[in-house]
């Protein structure tokens, strides 16, 4: 299970080069390296299961999305590529895309505003949903369901509208 992730700033334009490289190294290259090592072990055995923890944040494409969101979007594409390349080998690929999970890290980053995060799940709920998806060898699981629906609706809007809505949200937080 490749599940590392780091987050800097809210918008991509707030990142510096060092933060951007660190985000991409951890969020994307970390999954790639883990998948490569695991795949090389699993291929001779003709069985195995690669799992990536991505994020629902990677589903929306808009200009000012954070590098975290964009790197998780790349993880989603990486999982699709591995799934296709490994089809018929006995190796499964599951991509887990959670929304907000009530972790200590989320609290450290957001403090009291954490309670305002939409559809916040407990760690236990997230683990149970993830484990079920892994056990069932699902290709992809997006949760919580209400956030999945909200993102599905938002993704129908033009990127400029999505960007505007997120900028409004950021201004309200300030």
Q: What residue ranges belong to the model's regions?
A:
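Residue(s) in the substrate-gating loop at a strand-loop-helix junction
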Residues: 55
């Amino acid at each position: 299970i490749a599940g590392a992730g780091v987050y800097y700033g809210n918008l991509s334009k707030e990142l510096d080069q060092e933060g951007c490289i660190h985000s991409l190294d951890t969020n994307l290259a970390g999954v790639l390296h883990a998948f490569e090592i695991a795949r090389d072990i699993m291929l001779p055995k003709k069985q195995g299961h690669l799992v990536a923890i991505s994020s629902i944040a990677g589903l929306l494409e808009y200009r000012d999305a954070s590098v975290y969101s964009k790197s998780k979007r790349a993880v989603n594409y990486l999982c699709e590529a591995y799934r296709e390349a490994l089809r018929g080998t006995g190796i499964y690929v599951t991509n887990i895309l959670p929304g907000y999970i009530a972790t200590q890290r989320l609290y450290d980053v957001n403090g009291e505003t954490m309670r305002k995060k939409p559809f916040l799940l407990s760690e236990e709920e997230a683990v149970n949903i993830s484990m079920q998806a892994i056990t069932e060898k699902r290709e992809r699981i997006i949760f919580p369901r209400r956030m999945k629906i909200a993102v599905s609706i938002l993704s129908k809007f033009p990127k400029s509208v999505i960007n505007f809505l997120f900028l409004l949200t950021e201004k309200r937080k300030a």
